[in-house]
From Swiss-Prot:
Its main location: nucleus. Keywords: DNA-binding, Nucleus, Transcription, Transcription regulation. This is Putative B3 domain-containing protein LOC_Os07g12820. InterPro entries: B3_DNA-bd, DNA-bd_pseudobarrel_sf. The lineage of its organism: Eukaryota, Viridiplantae, Streptophyta, Embryophyta, Tracheophyta. One of its GO terms (molecular function) is DNA binding.
Amino acid sequence: MHSPTFSMVKIKTASQDYLPIPVAVTKASRLKHGRTLKLMTAHGLKIRVKVAEARDKLYMTIGWKEFIQEAGLKMGESKSVVFRTLSKSRLNVIIFNKEGYSRCPIPDKAAKALINNQSSSAPSFSTKSTAPRHPSFTNVEANTKRIVKDMCCYNKRMKLSSEVKNYVRDIAQFLDYSSKFYIVTMKNIHEVRQGDGCYNLKAGYGQISHKIIFKEIYSATSTASQQDTSGKNLHFSLPQDESVAGNSTSPVNAMFMPCTSNILLLL
């Protein structure tokens, strides 16, 4: 292949078991029934899918269901998927939300940020760019030994979705190596109330019960509860005698997790 081929697909099918393969991908990769494709994403997900023919059309079948589950896609979501044909057997997959933004954006300066944040005690990083220079298809891969368990303080009994784990991996390169954060899951933003009593929150690490945190979250979310708050930041400070699981860091930054009800408390 002399140049990469791009093809966008709107995910509208009600089935998780298959996906029609775009004609452009079929031609570029010269696909046939029985072939195998490797789907790859920016956060390192690599899954092989089988190609099958039905009614003169090719579909991704075995492996596609596993891919959408690992990528954090949900039924009923309005998503656009861009396939970038890397070779006859490899496709780079970029997922966009309904507003047209990459669901897991990685800025152009990722490679530079990684180099600047390194220290002699930090693990080695390798960074490479595999995308064309057009800003709409920017994609930087970063390989790091840091894993979710090293960075995220959460109760082991709390099951993290694939999307949350993928988002954690994507933002890891922009945090200091010593940085950790806590995940708080809000069952329903509208159920958070100011005042005394128990708040309808599940804490990711131990039991985060400081009312001032809940009040600040409520204050910041109540005005935006009717809007899409995915990826937006909250900023508030804690008094020195308040803490999150024993950490008295101030100020506290919080971020809404994209497409979830989770909030990150960055410490």
